[in-house]
Amino acid sequence: MALNAPSGSCSSKVLLHPLVIMQMSEHYSRTKVQQGPTVKKVFGAILGRQNGRQVEAINSFVLKMETEEMAEPVTFSTEHLLQRADQYLEVFPELQVIGLYCAGEDDNLTPEEKPLLSKLTNAVRNSEKAGQIDATLFLKLNSITAGTTRKLPLFAFEADVTDQEKHKPIEWILVSEESERVGVNHIAKLSTKHGKDGKSVGKKHAEAQDAAMSMLQNRVDLIVAYLEKVQDGTLQPNFEILKEANLLAQKLKTIDRYAAEFTDSFEKEEKTMTVFSLMPRLTTLLGNMQNVWNKLSAQRADLLADDGFHGKSTSRWAHPVRFKSQHLGRPQQADDDDYFDDEDLENDMSGPRRKIHAADSPAGSRRRRVPPRAMNFLGRNSGMQAATDEMELSGQEENMGSNYIPDVPRPSATAHNESDESSQAS
């Protein structure tokens, strides 16, 4: 609780909440940044309640000024004042307009501020919803000297009931509730020297929890010490404090009654949070598996694309040079050994066993392989016969399936006759 009692103060007192002071300072700083150094003062209305000679200032809002140039006489919009006051009355019926505040660069009430205070008083008294007050309160905050001294440069003035042109200083007392102290403490911790805080979110949360537990422990120790002093006769009993302590003890019994239910609920929540924490990991693992599968599929598609039969043939020699070089690790050679032979395939794929040559089978004499270059050579010499043989081979391959091996094309009789004639001519 802070007290400011200037000389000449009377019996009137003002109970001032921290929210009003914070809003006054924020209003001046924000306007100064937005409009530049030309702004010297800012004005706003104070909301609160009055109980006899005691006035309590709880909240405030900004007034809409008619001009921005402080060199000329300024005034505020009465329509905006009454509209905002009616809106607050709908939400908080106990709050009414009790005065005017000004945040500037001086301490005293200036001649240009007195007409504003008189205008606000007349507007409030003529309105049915804005509220009725005996004397208008005026708060003046010197934002220039704020922070240079330990004393808050805030001054309170009250208009005389008989003469509204006269104002006298009154004392003000800083009061706050438990929720307001927690909020102010939180804002003070977040506000650093350069607007930066190197602490992590987890560390801040842990510190807040530790501070709350420490405060609870201190309050419990204080209550226990007070009860011991009362029991010993050192202190006189205060029935209000004893009543609050009794209510707290009754709440402890309620907590013990629902301890088992609380434990079950806590365990269920813990399991749920554990499952939720595992879901991102499972999603990551599934993504990695999908990437591996995509790579394997791409490799398989690459191997099938290199197949001479476009992946439709499953015979052991229907694989080109690239597949053979990738499988055996041999350099690529564009010669007649472009295909796997039986010996290479059996030694590499099946391990050492008895070698079975194609000639051992009954069809070995007619099912022999000829390299592509030899087939092309015979095709050029035989003319139409080679083309006919290729058409027959393609038809037979479709009928017999992928295990069909084309027969070796044989030279025609015309080719033998031509060779005999050439030998006789020579």
Curated annotation (Swiss-Prot):
Single annotated GO MF: metallopeptidase activity
Cytoplasm as UniProt keyword: yes
Cross-referenced Gene3D superfamilies: Cytidine Deaminase, domain 2
Region (Disordered): 320-426
This protein's GO CC annotations: COP9 signalosome; cytoplasm; nucleus
InterPro entries assigned to the protein according to its UniProt record, in alphabetical order: EIF3F/CSN6-like_C (IPR024969), JAMM/MPN+_dom (IPR000555), MPN (IPR037518)
GO term, biological process aspect, one: regulation of oogenesis
Keywords on record: Cytoplasm, Developmental protein, Differentiation, Nucleus, Oogenesis, Signalosome
Acidic residues bias: start-end ranges: 334-347
Localisation: Cytoplasm; Nucleus
Principal localisation: cytoplasm
Domain MPN per the UniProt entry, residue ranges: 14-155
Quaternary data: Component of the CSN complex, probably composed of csn-1, csn-2, csn-3, csn-4, csn-5, csn-6 and csn-7. Within the complex it probably interacts directly with csn-2 and csn-4. Interacts with rbx-1.
Further comment found in the protein's record: Although strongly related to metalloprotease proteins, it lacks the JAMM motif that probably constitutes the catalytic center. Its function as protease is therefore unsure.
Function, as annotated: Component of the COP9 signalosome complex (CSN), a complex involved in various cellular and developmental processes. The CSN complex is an essential regulator of the ubiquitin (Ubl) conjugation pathway by mediating the deneddylation of the cullin subunits of the SCF-type E3 ligase complexes, leading to decrease the Ubl ligase activity of SCF. The CSN complex plays an essential role in embryogenesis and oogenesis and is required to regulate microtubule stability in the early embryo. Mediates mei-3/katanin targeting for degradation at the meiosis to mitosis transition via deneddylation of cul-3.
Similarity field: Belongs to the peptidase M67A family. CSN6 subfamily.
Descriptive protein name: COP9 signalosome complex subunit 6
Native source species: Caenorhabditis elegans
Annotated gene: csn-6
